[in-house]
Amino acid sequence: MATGSMRDHYRALKQVLQLWSEDKIRGPVPETWAQFQQRVADARAAIQRGGGQRVLAVSSGGPIAVTAQQVLAAPAASAIALNLQVRNCSISQYFFNADAFQLATFNGIPHLDHSERHDFQTYG
């Protein structure tokens, strides 16, 4: 994608996500923003019920961003901003138990942070 078209892509994506979060998309959508938020919260609750085990959750940028937004008790706009920053193959870490879920690291790429791997660093 050319630079201009990449910029246009992100601008359009941000606009659509904003409209979705405000329940302003007309026509059928696979799920509402509220349903999406609840699905992410339900997944996080299931992880918390896991008895303190180590968990590997593999996901896309949307649920990764919403998890961070929910854990930080930030507004919906934060989930959108975070989503646009999530790098492909990045690692986010949380510490959790039955009572708490806390962000430790977000969007890390230590496995790609080598000069010979810089070309592998991409965004959704």
PLM feature spans:
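Short, well-ordered beta-to-alpha junction loops that form the rim of enzyme active sites
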Residues: 55-63
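A broad detector of the eukaryotic-type serine/threonine protein kinase catalytic domain
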Residues: 21-25, 45, 52, 76
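Generic structural signal for well-ordered alpha-helical scaffold segments
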Residues: 37, 41-48
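Acidic, low-complexity terminal tails and accessory targeting/binding regions
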Residues: 1-7, 34, 49-54, 69-124
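Phosphate-handling substructures
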Residues: 1-39
